[in-house]
Amino acid sequence: MSKPTTLYDKIWNDHLVHEAEDGTCLIYIDRHLVHEVTSPQAFEGLRVAGRKVHAPEKTLAVVDHNVPTTDRTKPNPDPESAEQIATLAQNAKDFGIEYYNEFDKRQGIVHVIGPEQGFTLPGTTIVCGDSHTSTHGAFGALAHGIGTSEVEHVLATQTLIQKKAKNMRAVVYGTLPDGVTAKDIILAIIGEIGTAGGTGYVLEYAGEAIRALTMEGRMTVCNMSIEGGARAGLVAPDEKAYEFLKGRPKAPRGADWDAAMRYWETLRSDDGAHFDHEIRLDAARLPPIVTWGTSPEDVISVTGKVPNPADIADEAKRLSKERALHYMGLAAGTRITDITLDRVFIGSCTNGRIEDLRAAAKIADGRTVNGNVNAMVVPGSGLVKEQAEAEGLDKIFIKAGFEWREPGCSMCLAMNPDKLKPEERCASTSNRNFEGRQGFKGRTHLVSPAMAAAAAIAGHFVDVREWH
């Protein structure tokens, strides 16, 4: 009888090409996603070496980080961004790679378009020069970010050199209360383990609360695995995953689909499989969560107060949290619901999908954005935007006073015109609240889409459970 195996180990073993005596491995890569920021040097390296892309049919390119989310018929106001976008277009043409430019309705954030095109499939290995590649793990794919030199290596060989990670599991049992979402699950996990808690691990999410999530919700959870330090996040595929993928443009069809399904149905951790570390959370006890500091681990219930660093025994950690409070312009003991806002951003590869926009629109419907707040909604892709408009969500947002934008990474990061000004405070559905992440000296609080929409209307954080 074979030894019980984890989902991660199964996918890893199926893709292992070679293992050296020191544990360094060569693994085969099934899918490679490329965007404009981390790929220029990689393609240039291929040119200099006179190499071709080994498997262009397994590579998909899209612009997302640098594209403006306003009128795209006008020139890009940032020459460097415009150059990166033009460079990706030329590289895709030169190397024979499929490419979605800023005018293609399939364009969007790389981690939104992969699943919606059926490019992301269970049991595959997926890489991209982007840390939030872990998103694709929601489908039972082993997916993680890589550096630019590794992008070149994958383009040239369709393989990657790395050492195997350890296995970790987060079991989220019970049922989520109304007003509490997948975003709150992952923020709670990061708050529990810290931003280094998953270092050296691939993190599998399990339990009834995870199974109950939609695919959009699972993508939100897996997306932020990297914020917990993990190399990748995984959810075993099930009927929800298969239903999401069936009929997608790049998904298998007919007999190929049937063959794929036979393999996909083996993709789960066996009973009794060994995990090097495991944590458990009760979904029923989770509140809507807000980050208060400059790390994703700085989490608190919306009904709570900003913590006092003086209560922290470890000196280095205490000083770090004192610095965070100073940067955020907050005082210990401040009620979270007393924190007022200047900006609200709903979008990103964490929360820019149709389910996220529906949740925000449900809160915004019939209400008006606070006069002191500038709020924007940025769909994760052109297809998400098209679907939202077909459902009338754009009209709800616009009537409420939100800006309705074109798809892209937008205000998740300060690499395009959507930025915070110094000391502006933003409720954001994105994934990182580091110093300067959304703009120089900008202050970021991470929340769910419903929480962000409610904050935009109230002008400060509110407990969205009271609005349900």
UniProtKB/Swiss-Prot annotation:
A Pfam family recorded for this sequence: Aconitase
Supply one GO molecular-function term: metal ion binding
Q: Which cofactor does it need?
A: [4Fe-4S] cluster
| Record has Kinase as a keyword | no
| CDD domains linked | IPMI
Q: What's the superkingdom here? A: Bacteria
Q: Which PROSITE patterns match?
A: ACONITASE_1, ACONITASE_2
Which pathway does UniProt place it in?
Answer: Amino-acid biosynthesis; L-leucine biosynthesis; L-leucine from 3-methyl-2-oxobutanoate: step 2/4
Q: Tell me the keywords, alphabetical order.
A: 4Fe-4S, Amino-acid biosynthesis, Branched-chain amino acid biosynthesis, Iron, Iron-sulfur, Leucine biosynthesis, Lyase, Metal-binding
Catalysis performed (reactions): (2R,3S)-3-isopropylmalate = (2S)-2-isopropylmalate
**What top-tier enzyme class does this entry carry?**
lyase
Give the cofactor binding note: Binds 1 [4Fe-4S] cluster per subunit.
GO BP terms in the entry: L-leucine biosynthetic process
Under Enzyme Commission nomenclature, its number is 4.2.1.33
Binding partners and assembly: Heterodimer of LeuC and LeuD.
Name the family the entry cites: Belongs to the aconitase/IPM isomerase family. LeuC type 1 subfamily.
User: What's the stated role of this polypeptide?
Assistant: Catalyzes the isomerization between 2-isopropylmalate and 3-isopropylmalate, via the formation of 2-isopropylmaleate.
Q: Which PANTHER family match?
A: 3-ISOPROPYLMALATE DEHYDRATASE, HOMOACONITASE, MITOCHONDRIAL-RELATED
Protein name as it appears in the record: 3-isopropylmalate dehydratase large subunit
Per the UniProt record, the source organism is Nitrobacter hamburgensis (strain DSM 10229 / NCIMB 13809 / X14)
Q: Which gene encodes it?
A: leuC
